[in-house]
Structures are given as C-alpha cells and as structure tokens.
Amino acid sequence: MILSLCVLTPNRIVWDSEVKEIILSTNSGQIGILPNHAPIATAVDIGILRIRLNDQWLTMALMGGFARIGNNEVTVLVNDAEKGSDIDPQEAQQTLEIAEANLRKAEGKRQIIEANLALRRARARVEAINVIS
C-alpha cells in the first residue's frame, strides 16, 4: 500500500507523488501517517514534513496550514513550503541569526510575536536541511 501526498501553497504545487510514509508536524505534535490511516483533518504547525520514498527520507519545511487525511490520500495546504534540498544552507543560517537578533531587540507584544514567528520559520528551514535521514 502507498499514500498519495499532495503539498500545496497558494502559488504552487510543491509535491504531488506517491510515498510510503510521512511524519507531519501538527499543532499538537508530530504524527506518523502510514497507508490506511484513520481519516482526520488537522492543523499543520510551522515545522518539518518528513517523507519516506522506499528507503530514502526527504524533508520539507512547512510554514503552517492544515492537512486532510483519508482514503490513503494526504492533502497538505500550507502558507509556504520548501524542499530541504532546495534551501541554501548559508542563506538559511543567516536568516536564523537575523531572526534571533530581531527577537532579542523586539519591544512590545506585536514585535515579540512577529519575531517569534520569524524565528520559528527560520528554524524550520535550517532543520529541513540538517535532518539526518
């Protein structure tokens, strides 16, 4: 058995292929999804999507959204997504350092919230590169 995985952003289809298994970051933690998974709809957190193709694992940074799982089909609708292989490691690390600096100097609730979100997005991108398969 296999799963049909489709990852969509408002602007493009990031992934549309069959996979063996996925591990999805949700607002309540990570969930593993195998064929014949119970039907659910869940919020997707800023984090990593791990995709197993045969014996190889791929990663993708997801920027929040939601997912629908049912009938061996997984549809993930997110604000943005990047394959780990498409992320420039130096640029991602620089973005992370800038986000950390911005959080340290943030003042007021709004700035702190925005800086925290930017930091979480930057960490997800770095993690998508550094995940050991």
Curated annotation (Swiss-Prot):
Keywords: ATP synthesis, CF(1), Chloroplast, Hydrogen ion transport, Ion transport, Membrane, Plastid, Thylakoid, Transport. InterPro entries: ATP_synth_F1_dsu/esu, ATP_synth_F1_dsu/esu_N, ATP_synth_F1_esu_C, ATPsynth_dsu/esu_N. Its main location: plastid. Signal peptide: none annotated. It is found in: Plastid, Chloroplast thylakoid membrane. It holds the Pfam family ATP-synt_DE. Transmembrane segments: none annotated. The keyword Plastid applies. One of its GO terms (cellular component) is proton-transporting ATP synthase complex. One of its GO terms (molecular function) is ATP binding. The keyword Transmembrane does not apply. It comes from the Eukaryota. It is a peripheral membrane protein. Produces ATP from ADP in the presence of a proton gradient across the membrane. Belongs to the ATPase epsilon chain family. NCBIfam families: ATP_synt_epsi. F-type ATPases have 2 components, CF(1) - the catalytic core - and CF(0) - the membrane proton channel. CF(1) has five subunits: alpha(3), beta(3), gamma(1), delta(1), epsilon(1). CF(0) has three main subunits: a, b and c. This is ATP synthase epsilon chain, chloroplastic.
